Amino acid sequence: MSFQYHQTLDVKGAKCPMPLVKSRKTVNSLPVGNVLQVIATDRGSVADFQGWTKTAKNVELVGQETIQNNGQALYVHYVKRTA
């Protein structure tokens, strides 16, 4: 699946809660309507991003996917700034 995005944040190797902490800071610096692609290796980030975007008032989770890269799972999240 392919998603359009405006900026990429690489948080590979970071453990909870750092992928969310860094993503919040980065997405808040984007213009409204832009999408941030976040690439993580922490499997727990899938549920973390779902929970965060359900409760946050200024972001929307527009997609998630898991891809394999040299035998390693990468969890990719697409977060849109809405306000």
Name every feature range the model reports, one short phrase each.
Residues 4-6, 33-37, 74-76:
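Intrinsic-disorder/low-complexity, polar/charged segments enriched in Ser/Thr/Lys/Arg/Asp/Glu/Gln
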Residues 50-83:
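C-terminal structural segments of small proteins and small subunits
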Residues 45:
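Short phosphate-engaging motifs
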Residues 19, 48-49:
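Hydrophobic side chains in well-ordered alpha-helices
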